[in-house]
Amino acid sequence: MESWKVIMVVTPRGTFEVFYKGEGSPLCVSHLYSVFNSTGDYFADCFTGLYQVFLVNLREAGASEAAHEPFQLRMLESVLDLEAIREELGLPTWAFAGHSTGGMLGLVYGLAAPPFIESTGDY
């Protein structure tokens, strides 16, 4: 079984720890505050057969950037961080999947940056 690879993505908004695995169209998976590591995530693993999955540790999670101000932990700020990561990875768009608060983050992301979110059509 293929293991998750890790990269540190340096953006104008900070540096973020990102794990990736799989092939296909890009799919971002995140949780607002949980920490992911090289063992991946059961939820994210479900998508790696069809997508190149990017498992993102947001601020204050794992080796990602710390929050320097309390407002940086807001969902809209997290969307801006995700957009900076997507741009730095050179991806014109990606799909998004989240569970728990990551699901709520996905709703905010879809409202705030609709041109950059693709539908997986898997529902």
Regions found by a protein language model. Give the residues of each.
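A domain-start/cap signature at the N-terminus of enzymes
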Residues: 1-7
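Conserved HGGG/HGGXW glycine-rich cap/lid loop of the alpha/beta-hydrolase fold
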Residues: 10-66
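Short Gly/charged-rich anion-binding patches and loops
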Residues: 42, 80-81, 105
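Residue-level signal for well-ordered alpha-helical scaffold segments within enzymatic catalytic domains
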Residues: 46, 84-88, 108
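Alpha-helical structural context
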Residues: 50, 88-89, 112
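Active-site loop/oxyanion-hole signature of alpha/beta-hydrolase fold enzymes
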Residues: 54, 58-97, 101
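Conserved hydrolase catalytic core segment
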Residues: 92-123
